[in-house]
Amino acid sequence: MEDWIPLTYGKNCRLDPLATPNSGSHVERKYQDKKEKKEIEAGIATRTPFQIDKDRIIYSKAFRRLIHKTQVCFTGEMNEHIRTRLTHTLEVSQIARSIARQVHANEDLAEAIALGHDLGHTPFGHTGEKVLNDFLSGKDEGIKKKLLEKYEFDITEMKLHFKHNFQSVRVLIELEEGYKDFKGLNLTCPVLEGILKHTKLESNGQPIVYEGINENGAFHLDQKFSCSLEGQIVALADEIAQVCHDIEDAIEGNYDSKEIICIQLQRLIGEFDINDLGKNVDVKEMVAARQIKYFISCIIGQVISEAVIEIRKNMKDLNKSGLKAKYPLNKEIATDCVLDKHKLFQRLKEIENNFVINNYMIDRMNGKSSFVLRQIIKAYLTNPKQLPDHVLELYTEVCSVPALKDKIRKIGSTPANIRYLSKKDFENYQPAIIKDRAFLRLMSDYVASMTDLYALQEYQKLYGGESI
């Protein structure tokens, strides 16, 4: 399939030598896709492998659930015009496509990575991510103590972790369903690798361990940044979208720090020449006139324009060096190396960290969401049969306790799971279930898949009482 991309001004332009081509061994899938192979061999393929990946992501259940997952604040509790994880994803995709087009990278690959990059995110944003990682790694002292007292089990020894980029890949290779010939969505490696590396591979300096991912050589985990130009572009686009749009949402959502944020943005105008904004612009007047979107748009436009100039320079230098490998790419040309020296963006990041994330409303909501998720986890650990049947049926497939697996098979019910064990058998095997890393991972998968509203409803079903 030809390596060209359609440009908005109506011409076709071949991909840059550093862009990831649409054909080659790198686009092979784990499971052979007979339909795709047949169409390519017959010369009737209407989509590139990366377009197929993009379409599969869009039609996945995990993608649809993003609409009710938090970006920064609770969805449904504040201004409904505030971004969710889904709208953030679409905006990252738009920025990534825009940058890819300008540097002649593979737009389809950039879009596929962008659309899938947050599929593994938890309810309640990064708070949910921290709750699950603290639980699995043993940093949650309360849950760790409970497990030690009830089951004489130190979860720290399991060396399990949770991080949303790893979980996104797990969703795509293991958890999504709907195809008869393979598990997951059977995506190409450049898409999965770009999703995995759109953010850091460590948590607080500690490497993240995920079974089925760390040992996969195709992900090149010895290299912290993406092996494709397009993956690096998505990491850049994610940072730009997150920082700039979080600031806009804080103003639109009328955070208590809104006034301080406006003062900081006013100072920003004095420090930097921003395209289409004069030095005499009054930020408060723009907010009052509901023109903050235009203000943020001008800032994003400037950050992108200057980032593209830097990326082009890096690409030109690399092309001159005679580098032949298009994939995997072992040079960082479009991620932190671009944004780290971008003074305007770094000032925006300071504003986000100091006055958006560090905020009275957000702190209260984070406390609430942390409490809800910890209580849900405690309930499942107290009695695993409180998990729904589809999770328990999955556990039957992956259970790593041989005697228990045999006992379940002998139950005779279809489909079989631990719910149908006798009371005595369940009590005997419950400690082994809780200590089974396969169970702990599946339980975390289920909690991570919840939307904000579903998690709140689950808490109420488990504990009763008033709406929390």
Question: Can you describe what each PLM-predicted range is?
Answer:
Residues I99-A100, L132:
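Broad structural signal for hydrophobic residues in well-ordered alpha-helices, predominantly aliphatic
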Residues A112-I113:
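Active-site alpha-helix of zinc metalloproteases
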